[in-house]
Amino acid sequence: MNICDLAPAYIRAISPYQPGKPISELAREMGMDEQSIIKLASNENPLGTSPMALNAMSKALDEVSLYPDGSGFELKAALSERYGVTSDQIVLGNGSNDVLELAARVFLKPGASTVYSQHAFAVYPLVTKAVGGIGISVPARNYGHDLDAMLDAVAPETRVVFIANPNNPTGTLLPADDVLRFLERVSPDVLVVLDEAYNEYLPPALKGDSIAWLKQFPNLLITRTFSKAYGMAGVRVGFGLGHPDVAGLMNRVRQPFNVNNIGLAGAVAALQDEEFVKRSYALNQAGMLQIVTGLRQMGIEYIPSYGNFLSFRVPGNVKAINESLLKQGVIVRPISIYEMPEHLRVTVGLESENEKFLKSLAIALETTEGAAADTIPEMAVSFPKVASGGTA
């Protein structure tokens, strides 16, 4: 018998998560200079990292021989002050993915189910399957969550509902009132995980007061991350906010030192750097307008997005178009694993990166066999130039 046959069948059935292609990998494959490649595949911050966070992390290098504070006291204190919660309502994670996995480990067992939307974050089914749970994918409505259908899908064995707002990879946004009504209607015996990884990219008028809902709904867990607007994806820091009893259970099963010294120091400093987050938001607004304008000029359908990315429908052979982009040194994200085989997702980058993407896409559409020529206007496209400090 092969030793691997002893692993549970539900583990052996899992397909590994496929992240965006690294720049170094494409450089090796194509024999390219890494400096000539742009990566717009993983929703990373094109501005880099908060300078205050970088400074704090640099100082923390002197203590890498020591274990981190397993309780994350200073970061929890900073989060408590920022969000008006108590430290016992907080669970820290090695990125918000870690927090999602902790929720599954605590509340699921073989045969229990989770409910999530079609076209939602791939980690939801992964963490469900990893503990032997059953994932219920509810058909999307206009590429977003159909909350009424998701409520109907909740079964007696359902323990967790995942809601991404904004949603990745489609960028759709649920009005805060709709989410609140869902919380009021769903069974209090079901944990609702509200994944707000892209919250900082929302216009202020569209940000719901979800954290205030924690006082009313002990079955609500809100997850956020330092990977996106704070530009700290490489050091992996995320957090969850919930009822003290829920956070307490999750803290029982997390790894003792799941957030490292560097990440803890950087996150505390990043919370103080409000100017960097404002710049990230403004750049994203301007870049989104730049990309949307370019796609419109090419007659490309796209899904309006409230994140720092945009999914668009490719008129033709998606694989061939993506290969052409790669050969031109542009990495975007195929999203067939999200049941969107005709789409690609692009991260909003710097103005120059967005311009290179748009020009490369136009070339790919013009030169790739199988592209739908009737959707492609003349290729002498003048792409918009938008100042990085502007808004859309």
UniProtKB/Swiss-Prot annotation:
Reaction(s) catalysed (UniProt annotation): L-histidinol phosphate + 2-oxoglutarate = 3-(imidazol-4-yl)-2-oxopropyl phosphate + L-glutamate
Q: Which SUPFAM superfamilies does the annotation name?
A: PLP-dependent transferases (SSF53383)
Note one Pfam family from the annotation: Aminotran_1_2
Give the highest taxon in the source lineage.
Bacteria
Q: What enzyme class is recorded for this protein?
A: transferase
Q: Which cofactor does it need?
A: pyridoxal 5'-phosphate
Q: Which UniProt keywords apply?
A: Amino-acid biosynthesis, Aminotransferase, Histidine biosynthesis, Pyridoxal phosphate, Transferase
InterPro entries with a match to the protein in the record = Aminotrans_II_pyridoxalP_BS (IPR001917), Aminotransferase_I/II_large (IPR004839), HisP_aminotrans (IPR005861), HistidinolP_aminotransfase (IPR050106), PyrdxlP-dep_Trfase (IPR015424), PyrdxlP-dep_Trfase_major (IPR015421), PyrdxlP-dep_Trfase_small (IPR015422)
In which pathway is this protein known to take part?
Amino-acid biosynthesis; L-histidine biosynthesis; L-histidine from 5-phospho-alpha-D-ribose 1-diphosphate: step 7/9
State any single GO MF term.
Answer: histidinol-phosphate transaminase activity
Biological processes per GO annotation:
L-histidine biosynthetic process
Q: Give the Enzyme Commission number.
A: 2.6.1.9
Write out the similarity annotation.
Belongs to the class-II pyridoxal-phosphate-dependent aminotransferase family. Histidinol-phosphate aminotransferase subfamily.
State how it assembles.
Homodimer.
Name-wise, this protein is Histidinol-phosphate aminotransferase 2
Source organism per entry reads Nitrosospira multiformis (strain ATCC 25196 / NCIMB 11849 / C 71)
Gene it is expressed from: hisC2
